[in-house]
């Protein structure tokens, strides 16, 4: 799934939930990094369509074969495992924070879960969760409603993630 139209079609088939909503399509269809409000609008609509059914949204997974016209990637020997996905978000934290704030806010309209992609180390898991908690703190201080008890996890899709799976499972 990667769009509201996909969610609408899935709901017609009485699905139990969505296990992977690919948020990168929201970015790929834009000429700029979507704002918090732009993302919130899409995630809220998806959550409302599903009601109490789970909606697992993967945070931005660009790099490798998924580029953006408005973002330059460094030249790498293996761009599929290098500077992409969660590493971009942790390096350029405002990109990740904007998305997490939108997801947390939209979670008040349904049952949203967050999935961090392309994890290669336990440090990335710890850092991603720290950014999530930072966003919760900000929203709380600003008095903005959000899904406080949001579930978050990681996508096990790299050899390094498999190797550190035992340690990762203790954190998520």
What residue spans do the PLM features occupy?
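Conserved alpha/beta-domain cores
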Residues: 1-170
């Amino acid at each position: 799934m990667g769009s509201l139209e996909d969610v609408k079609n899935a709901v017609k088939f009485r699905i139990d939930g969505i296990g992977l909503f690919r948020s990168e399509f929201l970015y790929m269809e834009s000429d700029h990094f979507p704002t918090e409000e732009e993302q919130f609008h899409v995630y809220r609509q998806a959550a409302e369509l599903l009601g109490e059914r789970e909606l697992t949204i993967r945070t931005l997974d660009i790099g490798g074969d998924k580029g953006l016209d408005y973002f330059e990637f460094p030249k790498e020997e293996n761009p599929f495992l290098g500077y992409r996905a969660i590493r971009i978000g942790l390096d350029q934290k405002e990109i990740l924070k904007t998305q997490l704030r939108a997801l947390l806010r939209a979670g008040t309209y349904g049952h949203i879960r967050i999935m961090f992609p392309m994890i290669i180390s336990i440090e990335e898991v710890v850092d991603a969760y720290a950014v999530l908690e930072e966003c919760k703190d900000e929203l709380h201080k600003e008095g903005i409603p959000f899904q406080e008890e949001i579930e978050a996890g990681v996508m096990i899709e790299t050899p390094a993630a498999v190797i550190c799976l035992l340690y990762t499972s203790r954190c998520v």
